[in-house]
Each structure stands twice: as structure tokens, then as C-alpha cells.
Amino acid sequence: MPRRLTTKLRSSFASRVAHPKALLLAVCSFFIASNCFSSLSTSALPETKKTSIGRPSTIRVPATGFQSHLRSIPGLRVSPSLFPSTAVDESRPALEEDTEGRGDWFTFQRTYPSNSIPPDARLRAWNSRQRNQVANLAPQAAQTWRSVGPTATVSAWYPFWGLTSGRVNAIAVSPANSSLVLVGASTGGIWRSTNGGESFVPVSDDQVDLAVGSIAFSKSNPSIAYAGMGDTKFGYMGSGILKSTNEGKTWLRVSNSSLPSPGTIAKLEIDSSNPDRVYVAQYSTVAGNKVTSSGLYVSTDGGIKWKRTLAGAPRDVVIDPSDSKVLYAGLSRIEKDTDPDFGLYRSSDSGDTWTNLFSAQYDLARRRDFRVAISPANPRMIYTYFGGFVGSNLDARLRFSTDAGTTWTDRFLWTIDTAQLGYNTYLAADPQDPLTVYIGSRDLFKSTDGGGSWTNLTGNFYDSGAGFQYAPGGSATHTDQHALAFSPANPNEFYLGNDGGVSKTTDNGASFSSLNRTLTLSQFIGIALHPTNPAISYGGTQDNGTQIRSADSTWQEVLTGDGGHVVINPLDPSVVFMTYVRGDIFRVVNNGQSFELQVGSNATFGEFFQTPRIAFYPPFVGNGVDSTLYFGSWRLFISTNLGNSWFAPAGSLDLTKGVREVGSDVLSAIAVARSNRSVIYTGSVQGRAMRSTNGGQSWVDITAGLPDRSITSIAIDPTNPSIAYVSVSGFNTGHVYKTTNTGASWIDVSGSLPDIPASALLIDPSDPNTVYLGTDIGVFRSTTQGNDWRSFNRGMPPVVVHGFSANGSGVIQAATYGRGVYELGGPSDRPSIVSVDFNGKKRLTISGTGFGDSPKVIINGQDRSNRLSESSDTSAVLSGKTKKLGLKSGDNSVQIITSDDLSSNVFTITVIL
């Protein structure tokens, strides 16, 4: 049977096996954070970190375990107290990250119960939002969110990875200007660099969609670029095709309904001689039972109208560099009864018709990935890379042809790490050598003999003889590779996109530099703001761990892997509880700098099997008053002694809808009343709401009146536990419901809200009449207890908002899934750039507010403060020759940083010299 979402979800909340990147969390992350980086900010770090792993074959973890491995690194001192007793057994092979479980967690909420997303749902919601801008409200409503980073993150493996950011799916280098680089983030939009990646600025924040699947420049007219939207890596559905006619400076959505929604663009290609002829491989798994939006589509009018010429689920499409009429497409297979065979297809008539060159002869019912690359140096040399999809028995292989597809030879890939194929997957042919080919997996592998032998260029995993073992000490980049783009001017220079952002090599992969200093792409799951110090925050992110903010935009990764929810002990804020996925909870002391104890696991919560009923990112909260902790599986667990022990006050009572055909239901939201901690509300991913008035000992079902949708958040009035709000995900329903009688009845207070999934609620602690709602297109706010809503997104792009946190100083933070953390309130003297003027010769004037008398001026990521000729609180003037000012033709980024490390917005000035 085909593996649809409904069948996957039987295991979506089941723990596959804990990823070693997370199990190493305390082993390495806390050590590095507390011993190496406790006093560092990103401004004190090198602009880029160049890392070479030397001979990959020498990377080994001693049999005595990872502590010995850390001790073997020069300059590192290991304190035994920093290592938990549950540290990973390094003698075992590394197991796969649960990328599919993460994807199911994200997708199930949005598709339950129909297993589909309505066509153009996001676009309609966006248009509705535009009609309800907060500018229509009173003047005091015109507050502005500001980004507080991470820009970028001091990674747990900083000596090797450098600074990190969030997941990058696509990279394109201009064929006319090798310094012009575009990157597409998973859910963070398009970013542009004019200096080879030294600095980036976002350029698509005014568009409906920030999920990017593919980007390409036109070779015949490099002013034109296209972006295919959507994240095929279990992220977010796309809204079609964006187009730029000015080298990526600005973008417009051009595709009409002939490119059906929803879908994700896995690959986009442009005809080498005709910039109006565009091909896209659109891939979708949640467009209904028959996945009708998937297929290979062709446009001949610059991306407006589209025609599907090949049905199925394509993962890749490439154009023959010697003949633009010849195309190759790699097809996956989802629907066994209706999809074409999984395999390689060729078109000789510009994509009008297709012929199958070969099909895999095994396990066609499984979903698979399929990638294609053609050697620019010898277009008769074609490589394909295919196999299973994020699971066991991948059967990955490289199949190549030296005669343009007439005959084929298999290369088995037993010596390289192909784990997570379908998540971190690409194939690239060297522009000069037809025998050199690259495979992106968890690491980047290179072959110079047509796939006969391989070298690991990034070095996070090594072959232990019994599988690939995770040992990033000595590695060169973040794990999980998603994109590779060559520089047209230098064949030894190429860019990598991975789960940690962008890296670059200028020596053909011998070493890599991190290019993440100006990128803010982290995908946060939640946020916890220090109760008294608004400069300190904690948040869990997708594959960039749990991070601590200790300065304006400086964050440090202290818990590796996937970070979940965080709880700060209100009685002693130096004690923090951090989560990985499923049931793993860790107690950290010394303001997040020292690991103390693992206080939760699947077994802790009675889940002893490989398929525990615990959400991928389970609900985990405090009550804001004392140190009591609350954790949800399908039951509610409580700890009153800092996590040292847990109990289920209602015993084995199931607070969810139980085990059903669509999968095992689990808790997704918990809220405890501050004014009466005996009142507790819970919500489940399949829409069951429960309430207890005696501390969780007994429960009442309060689902009646709520829609059959995933409950994502619950907020209780701080002074009246009878008043509560519930947010729900999905479509074709209201998204905020309110009770005034402890759940006995519910009122739909969605009002003018667009029909878009909602994930987070916050009642303003200083004004219970004001409620904030985090949705998939940003923040909405009601100042009338939910009676009406207005878009409250000034300063924030249309990004998914997963969580809020607030403290008594009036600061509110929003955790976004793709653009880091945004803050409302905060220091009133924060600098802001209003305008920048360059006279074209020797003088640059920056105007704004809050500069102080000696601001630091950052131009294109470089400190140019020594060029200051005069400054005040409202202006800064730099004088000198153009070269000394650091300005060059094209876009330049300008930023002000005050003496107390407060930073302004990044201002872009275009210089024509």
C-alpha cells in the first residue's frame, strides 16, 4: 500500500531511536558552552571559520567513548561532572535522526482530519491579512517587532562548524557575477549576498511564502531569477513561483492556478537560451489521496501559465548542458496504482513528452528519492542517485551512463553514509571533470573516479565497520546537506546549504568557511524568557539544539540535535529545564551553562516500547508561580521536586482520543492557571480538550463546542481560571475559541481572522484584555478579549509563529519557525536606522535614533568605526576614500551597534560607482 500521511502517523508519535546528536548533548554541548564560549559574543568571533578535516579516514572515536574523544582534542579540558550517566554508547553505530517524525509533527497538525490542505489556502489568508492591518487601530498599536537573532549561533561544535544558522534548501550563484549569491531557506525566505556570502540581506519578506525549495538564475539573462516555493523536507507547502527581474533584489509571485496548490517545488530549471521557458518538479504528499498537484510542469511565458507534461512525484529535473531540448527527470513513487514507475525519464522535445529510461525493480510500493546530474564537461556522462526514503533498507545506489543513457552501470554505495536519503539528499557533477561527482547526505562525499571510491569532505560521521558513527570533533560543517552550488568563475569554489546554514570552500572541499554571520534562519519550537532579565532567553530549534541568548542577537547552542520546549524555574531562574524530543528532559544550572541531570526519558513516563505515545515535541510547561513541572504524553505527569521524580495524578487515565485509525493520539497542549494551580487544561493533537479542577486527579471532557482539529495552545486568564482560550490548527474552521465557564461551553472568537493554522496564544500579563495569536503568517492581536483581531506583524515577515513568552518588564518574545526570535518592548533607546546617504565620493551619512555618541558602524559585516568623522545620538558620518569606507557597487548592508551591544536594523544601500 502507498505510504500516505495517515499510515505514517501510526508511527509519527512513536520514537524511532534517539538520534546520537541529541544523546551527545550534555556530553559536548554544555562542556563547550560553559568552558569555551561563556564570555563570547558573535562580534568577538572571526568573520568566518575556516575548517579543514584533514584526512577523513583518520577520524575515529576511541572505543572508550566520547569523553576520551573530547580529551583527545587539543586545548579542551573535560570535567567528568558535565557528562550524564546516560551518554551515548560510542561503540554502537550512529542511528538516524527522526526527520520523518519531525515532519509528521509539523504536517499532521495542519492536515488533520482531512489529510489535505485546501488549494491556495495560504494565499487567501495572506490577502485577508492585508485587509486587516493593525495600522487601522489606535496609534499606540503601531508597535514594531524587532529581530533578536540568532545572528548567528555559536554552535556546540564551534571550533569545527563555525557560526550556524537554520536550514538552507537552495543556493544559486549568478552566472554573470560570482559574488552574487541567493540562498533559499526552509521557512526563512530568500536572502541575497553581493560579496560572495560575506553578508546577506533578506529580499522576499513582502511575499506570501517564506518556504523555498529551489532557486535558479537564467543563464541567458542573469537579471532574471526564479524561486520555487515550498519545503519538500517535511516543512511547508509552497505558493508557486516567485520571479525577479533585477538580479534577486525584489520578487513577485507570477504563477497562476495552472500550477496547482498545494505543492512544493523540489527543483526548478531554466532553459539556457530562453529565460521564459521554465521547468519545475513539483512534489506533494498532502494534496489529497491522489496527490494531483504533483508532476513535472513546463511554462513558456516566464512562469505565469503551466502545463503538466509528466505525472507522478518528481524529485529532480535537469537540462542537458549541450542541448537544452533534452531533459532528465527523476521520479519518486507515492501512489502505487496511479503513479508512473519510479525511475529516470528523458524528454527530447523540451519536456513535451517523456520516455522511461529505467525503473527500479524492487519495492515499488515504497516512497523513494531519485536525483540526477549531468557532467557539464561531458554531457554524455549522466549520474543518478536513488533509493529508499528516510528509513531502513534504503538500498541506495549510484547508477551512471557514459553514453547519454543508452547503457547503465551500478555503483553500490556501501562505503558512504546514505542515511536519511530523501531528507538530506543531492547529487552534483563537477563542472570540469566528468569523473568527479558529489553526493550530499548527512555529510558531503566526493568521488573522483565516477563513484568507485569516496572521500568524506565534512567529516561528521565515520564508518566504524558496523555502521556510521557520529563524531563531529574535527568536522568541517554542520550535518545534513541539502544544496551545493558551484561558482562560475572558480571551479574550486562552491557553496553548501545544510541544516546549519551556508558554508563555502575555495579550495575544492579541502576546507570550509561558515557564512552565517548575517543570516537569521533558526526554526524555533518555543521560547522561554527570563522572568526578570529580558536579555536572557532560551529556546529549542530544529537541528540546532536548545540555545541561550545572552546578548542582543548572540545565541549559544548548549543542547544539540532537535531542541524542544524550555521551562525556567521562577523561584530560581538559574535552574532551567530543557527538552530534546519525546520524553527527554534535562536539568541545567548556572543559567544554562552547566548540565546537572537528565530528569526525563520515555521510560520515565511509562513508555518502554520503541513506539511511545509521546509527541515529537511534547507539551512541557511550568505554572509561573512555583517550581512544579507538567509534562504530557497521553497522560499528564507532574513533578514537584525539580524533575527528580514524576507522578501521574490520574493514573492511567487517557486524556486523548486514544489509539485510532489515523494514529495514536497524544497531548499537544497544557496550561495551568496561575491564580489557582489546581485548574489544569489539556489539549490533544486529535482535538480532545480536558479540564481538571483538583490538580489533575480527575478530569472532565470539555471537547464539545470545539472543532475536530489539532489543539495547539491554551491560555488561561491570569486572574480568572474560568476564562481560557484555545487555538487550533488546520483549515476550514475557526482558529480561536474562548470559554468563560471553565470549558462547559466554547465561543468561536475567530472573527475576522484568516483561515490559517494557529499555533500559539499569549494573554498579555499587563493587560488581560489583550491576546496575541501566533499563526502560519505571523502574529494577530486582539485588545478586546478576542472580540476582534488585527494583524500585528509590523517588523516581522509572514513566518510561522510557534510560541510566545513574556515577563514582568513588559517584554514579549515570539518564537518563529524560520526567522529566529522577535521581541516587542525592550529597551527604548535601541538604535534604528532611518536613512543612509552616500555622496558618491567620500562621505557616508547614517541617520536615525539611539546611536549614542560613539556607535560602532558595521558595513558589509566589517567594523568601519575607525572611519567615523563625527557622530551623535541621531547620526553618524564616515569620511574617507570609497575603498576605505568598504562600499562597492551594488547592495551594501549598514548596521549600527551601540556601546551596550544594542544593534539597529540592517539597512541596505545600493551604490552605483
Please place each PLM-identified region on the residue numbering:
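N-terminal secretory signal peptides that target proteins for export/translocation
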Residues: 1-18
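Bacterial N-terminal signal peptides
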Residues: 22-35
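Signal peptide processing junction and immediate N-terminal pro/mature segment
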Residues: 36-50
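Beta-propeller blade termini and top-face loops
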Residues: 54, 58-827
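Beta-strand/beta-sandwich contexts
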Residues: 827-856, 864, 891-893, 901-913
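Solvent-exposed serine/threonine-rich low-complexity stretches and specific carbohydrate-binding patches
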Residues: 862-873
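Aromatic sugar-binding surface patches on proteins
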Residues: 871-881
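Surface-exposed, short loops/turns at beta-strand junctions within beta-sandwich domains
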Residues: 882-890
